[in-house]
Amino acid sequence: MYVLLTILTSVLVCEAIIRVSLSSTREETCFGDSTNPEMIEGAWDSLREEEMPEELSCSISGIREVKTSSQELYRALKAIIAADGLNNITCHGKDPEDKISLIKGPPHKKRVGIVRCERRRDAKQIGRKTMAGIAMTVLPALAVFALAPVVFAEDPHLRNRPGKGHNYIDGMTQEDATCKPVTYAGACSSFDVLLEKGKFPLFQSYAHHRTLLEAVHDTIIAKADPPSCDLLSAHGNPCMKEKLVMKTHCPNDYQSAHHLNNDGKMASVKCPPKYELTEDCNFCRQMTGASLKKGSYPLQDLFCQSSEDDGSKLKTKMKGVCEVGVQALKKCDGQLSTAHEVVPFAVFKNSKKVYLDKLDLKTEENLLPDSFVCFEHKGQYKGTMDSGQTKRELKSFDISQCPKIGGHGSKKCTGDAAFCSAYECTAQYANAYCSHANGSGIVQIQVSGVWKKPLCVGYERVVVKRELSAKPIQRVEPCTTCITKCEPHGLVVRSTGFKISSAVACASGVCVTGSQSPSTEITLKYPGISQSSGGDIGVHMAHDDQSVSSKIVAHCPPQDPCLVHDCIVCAHGLINYQCHTALSAFVVVFVFSSIAIICLAILYRVLKCLKIAPRKVLNPLMWITAFIRWIYKKMVARVADNINQVNREIGWMEGGQLVLGNPAPIPRHAPIPRYSTYLMLLLIVSYASACSELIQASSRITTCSTEGVNTKCRLSGTALIRAGSVGAEACLMLKGVKEDQTKFLKLKTVSSELSCREGQSYWTGSFSPKCLSSRRCHLVGECHVNRCLSWRDNETSAEFSFVGESTTMRENKCFEQCGGWGCGCFNVNPSCLFVHTYLQSVRKEALRVFNCIDWVHKLTLEITDFDGSVSTIDLGASSSRFTNWGSVSLSLDAEGISGSNSFSFIESPGKGYAIVDEPFSEIPRQGFLGEIRCNSESSVLSAHESCLRAPNLISYKPMIDQLECTTNLIDPFVVFERGSLPQTRNDKTFAASKGNRGVQAFSKGSVQADLTLMFDNFEVDFVGAAVSCDAAFLNLTGCYSCNAGARVCLSITSTGTGSLSAHNKDGSLHIVLPSENGTKDQCQILHFTVPEVEEEFMYSCDGDERPLLVKGTLIAIDPFDDRREAGGESTVVNPKSGSWNFFDWFSGLMSWFGGPLKTILLICLYVALSIGLFFLLIYLGGTGLSKMWLAATKKAS
């Protein structure tokens, strides 16, 4: 880059020389070199302004000939510099005489290389250029070279300082005399450091203004009291307190550092002799053999000027800022964020340091003395130093000695046009030459909408405390003011003002959802069998309150199943006979009988009207009636014969006459069969499963051995078992050598989820732009030729480099504005409004947006091993988890869901999830979520430059000296609050998964799940001394022929910690419950297919088995539900294949009524009464209608 700058600047100078040549054919050679690297863009733009041929033919080192354009010449220049062995490049247009030749020479001393540029042009072509054209070409070229930011140290006039030019701190005796004042030839470390590249870009852009030290010596800025703090004795000193809130960096070998303090005065910190400041400028370090620099290091990037603008009544506000450094701007009671930030500041007359929310600068050129630099030559004839010199050097000249127009002066001066318009320029031999200093005009900043002239303006990196204007997303908190009621028709949740849109209720691993139009009350179905069994029910609600969502735990007491399921007309209400009274049962029979009679009557009438053999239709009915009568008579006769036979046998009746004598002797007869035939025909065996799935470890994987009274079994192999439904258990039974040696491995299905498998994701947040602007006149700073029109977004103006060096998202603009005297410029060409805009995060939190590429089923299992240890694991399809006894894997046969591509999801880490009603976009698009997206949460918080942005997000409105920048971004936090889960879309409810670890979907689906248990030489010990226990049956609640099952509760009293196992007589049913010291109630889920349960178990804790009777009545819950409801329920695991069965139900009905004969008689009685009542009502209705008809007829006649 260093050599490339030399090439470009040499070409420009060479071009200028050729243009002013009028010879027919001239060959000019120029040499150039530089010791500093340089960005080439500005010089290249000027090079393209030269009227070069559109098409060039270039020969690189004479090796190859390439065709290129002037636009591509830049690449060719880079090639000759970078490539080894390429020593020259020659380009010419269609006319071979129009040629540019660049020759790369060998390195020489400190110079990287020597470049010779040759340009040949025809005299006629040169002659077409006017002097005005020549001037417009040469001046921009010189401006590029002279005003490039990196060559400040080579511009001798930068050391021609305004005012006294003193750059030293009083009391520093070792300060070199060259700082009192700064001279052209002398070295002053306090000033020279300001010209180093990249360190103080703001001052370098306004280098002809005063430094802080110069402003102090020119009495523009006062000194602090005390003016300097010794770090070794500065404990508790106020100046040290201000220094500590600044983030600073001091180079090595500096003994002192200075800054502008909060009072608008200069303060400094210093170390004793032979000590240097450490890199953080907070400590002193002694270095042996090192020579300390004789100067003070500036801790802020600033410049100063003289001003009379009063700032005593000036009040500024920084949006959302509570404190900057030691200055408290406002009182903040909420949460604060603290960070080091680059903050602009200014100092006015009679004011303290004023921090600014943004910095808008404008410069007005003027003819004041500080706007000119005057110099003379050392050794100049009749100069102040006219003695002979060994070096060619310049010397500053006091402009006050030059006469103003209409005034008097002691010296004769000459200068440029600007100087001669304000001062008398002599036509004779002058004492000094004066010229206008570029960028030396009056600088004004905008404060509270008013342009004011500050004494000093600059940047510093300081601690800033900001209030979190937008409240962070709150975690899901319990709703302490909500009210819950366990109503018969459902669980009612009432809020205290916010409107609930959807909710999820869960109990015992079973969840149900509900959605509605936003209301302060929502009614949810009871999950599982919680309506009758009672217990805690967790409810998660989505609402329109400030918080994302709320949760509440409702406790419902156990209730009589017949009271909570009291529907008479619905299906489950009709078949729950145990819940009917005599009146309700009669109503049911009457309704069905009436419907049957009406249907038969209608059918008869229709057939009769159509004359379709009504008599023949009645014949089957008559035959059926006759057959029923015959069966009835036979049954009555048989019963009567049996009764008479019994009476005769006991002597109550003899030939139909009552015998009053001694009773006849009772003969021996066989037992009377009674109703055994009917019972055998109608007997149906019930089925139950305590451990929903139970297998016994086979001998192929079990090896047992006995050691005294103890038995040790080793398991090695694989066992396959079906997973239990939600709330139920799958058990592996391990039997020892003895009958009383039994242990179980239980896997309880705690919950089932249909979880989201995430695809692509990104992080986003809320951002706002902040823009800085500065207007510079044409040919001042970087405003030259067409630089403004060709300004690139990634190119930062030098005066904003101190802010632009951060890694935040930023862009740069340049807008051409008016020029001339009316706009404060000498040059009539357009001025340049340079803009630096950066984005900052509004909230100190970020959101993650993701999509779901698939929905997979996942089970949460609670594993109780053989020793009673409990652990909880999550298993997905085809996944495995390792345990202390081996591993367990899950195989699933299930269907997922579809239709989720039309929306995406948002996660607030640790706080919740939300749904977005738009598909996931892979690229940022304006007007959609994710206009700004980052790859990490920290990148969002810092608004890092690595984040992707949609184009043209920031809108600009330039207004001559200032600019407005605005954005219209989608706020993801508003979207998050509006779509916080749970939400219902496409008849599916989406909610946060268990533990808030993802998103799950509720759909009325089921899954077939199998568990594979793999044992790896696991040993199980059966201890000889067993624990004794007693168990008593408490209750049986729940449903039959349902997936929820029934809950069997036992009261267990044990002498220690162990387990209770129970089985029925044939060993087909097992109950396994833990036992603890003392008395404790334990419950387990079982599944039955009959409403009447009466099962005898044998239980044991120590091998001594005792009987246990489990008895109760269950009800049916919604066996037929064809209603379409939005939302859904949690996935059913291994649904029970046996549905509601009529024969099982009728068997329970007969048991309920006391036997089959009594059941048939009661049914017949109810049917007969219903038919009689029906015809009675028909008769009464017909009679009443007839009387009414007759009365109406008589009245009409």
Curated annotation (Swiss-Prot):
Residues 777-783, 819-830 are annotated as: Fusion loop. Residues 17-130, 604-673, 1181-1197 are cytoplasmic. Residues 1-16 form the signal peptide. Glycans are attached at N794, N1035, N1077. Residues 154-582, 691-1159 are lumenal. The record marks K1194 as: Important for glycoprotein C and glycoprotein N subcellular location. The chain crosses the membrane at residues 583-603, 1160-1180. The record marks A153, E154, A690, C691 as: Cleavage. Pfam families: Phlebo_G2_C, Phlebovirus_G1, Phlebovirus_G2, Phlebovirus_NSM. The keyword Cell inner membrane does not apply. Residues 646-650 are annotated as: Important for correct targeting of the glycoproteins to the Golgi complex but not for heterodimerization. This is Envelopment polyprotein.
